[in-house]
UniProtKB/Swiss-Prot annotation:
Keywords attached to this entry: ATP synthesis, Cell inner membrane, Cell membrane, CF(1), Hydrogen ion transport, Ion transport, Membrane, Transport
Main location group: membrane
Subunit structure: F-type ATPases have 2 components, CF(1) - the catalytic core - and CF(0) - the membrane proton channel. CF(1) has five subunits: alpha(3), beta(3), gamma(1), delta(1), epsilon(1). CF(0) has three main subunits: a, b and c.
GO biological process: proton motive force-driven plasma membrane ATP synthesis
Membrane topology, as annotated: Peripheral membrane protein
Native organism: Histophilus somni (strain 2336)
Phylogenetic classification of the source organism: Bacteria, Pseudomonadati, Pseudomonadota, Gammaproteobacteria, Pasteurellales
SUPFAM superfamilies: ATP synthase (F1-ATPase), gamma subunit
Protein's name according to its UniProt entry: ATP synthase gamma chain
Function: Produces ATP from ADP in the presence of a proton gradient across the membrane. The gamma chain is believed to be important in regulating ATPase activity and the flow of protons through the CF(0) complex.
An annotated Gene Ontology molecular function: proton-transporting ATP synthase activity, rotational mechanism
A Gene Ontology term for the protein's cellular component: plasma membrane
InterPro entries associated with the record: ATP_synth_F1_ATPase_gsu (IPR035968), ATP_synth_F1_gsu (IPR000131), ATP_synth_F1_gsu_CS (IPR023632)
Length: 289
């Protein structure tokens, strides 16, 4: 059994670690709430653009934007959004499993796959696999700036318009709640058809006049909409990261508390044994006299 002094040192070390994990838990909780607010505030913008795009595309059936046209899929682009930092449980591992499963499915169909990577963890992982990477970006911090994300998104969209990619998907961790984050893959382009239920029951009740003309507006809005979808995915992934980190740090804090309790019992036993030995020595010395 270790001596009482060694056990006291271990207890002190675990207590220091517990203070750090508790602080990280509280910081993650604060950041998660801020990210949730940012996530909620960006949704109405995306919803409004969805409605306008649906209205214009249905009213001008003679004009088909490339982002709305389905074509034979020979090349797929996947935008994978991961975290820049660790200590967030199995968040990235589950995301990578989802992405690799889809990549495997595409390759089995003889479809070429190109990746766009956002987040240092994803960049490091997929570079090690030797997959084709078309664009990458990291160092977003806790408040991602839309302008910084537009570059990597536009590279994927330009490749689609040039015919180098036939479909683009985005993979990220969808924020369900504090305890649940789900890795998902969603189609970006060609844009899935929007039904009236997803746009609101009054989406077709008004006739609008668009200037300079519907086609020019549609060209601009589609790009803005897709950029907003990428930004929304990044923000949701960030909220998932903070939630996962908060849960992981809480578990670490609780485990540290349990370890301290166990060490305290061991320390008490060691101290009791030491006192017993000292008493035995005193009694033995007195008996010898």
């Amino acid at each position: 059994m270790a001596g009482a002094k060694e056990i006291r040192t271990k207890i002190s070390s675990v207590q220091s670690t517990q203070k750090i994990t508790k602080a990280m838990e509280m910081v993650a909780a604060s950041k998660m709430r801020k990210t949730q607010d940012r996530m909620s505030s960006s949704r109405p913008y995306s919803k409004a653009i969805q409605g306008v795009i649906s209205h214009i595309s249905k009213a001008n059936i003679d004009y088909q934007h490339p982002f709305l046209i389905e074509r034979e899929v020979k090349n797929v682009g996947i935008l994978i959004i991961s975290t820049d930092r660790g200590l967030c449980g199995g968040l990235n591992v589950n995301l990578f499993k989802t992405a690799l499963s889809e990549i495997k499915n595409w390759k089995e169909q003889n479809v070429d796959v190109s990746l766009g990577l956002i987040g240092a963890k994803g960049i490091g992982f997929f570079q090690s696999l030797g997959l084709k990477i078309k664009a990458q970006h990291s160092g977003m911090g806790d408040t991602p700036v839309a302008e910084e994300l537009i570059g990597i998104a536009n590279r994927m969209f330009e490749a689609y318009k040039e015919g180098k990619i036939d479909a683009i998907y985005v993979t990220y961790n969808k924020f369900i709640n504090t305890m649940s984050q789900k890795p998902i893959m969603e189609k970006l382009v060609p844009l899935p058809e929007l039904d009236n239920d997803s746009l609101g029951k009054n989406s077709d009740n008004w006739e609008y006049i668009y200037e300079p003309n519907p086609q020019t507006l549609l060209d601009s809005l589609l790009v803005r909409y897709l950029e907003s979808q990428v930004y929304q995915a990044v923000v949701e992934n960030l909220a998932s990261e903070q939630a996962a980190r908060m849960v992981a740090m809480k578990a670490a804090t609780d485990n540290a508390g349990n370890l301290i309790n166990d060490l305290q019992l061991v320390y008490n036993k060691a101290r009791q044994a030491s006192i017993t030995n000292e008493l035995n020595e005193i009694v033995a010395g007195a008996a010898a006299i």
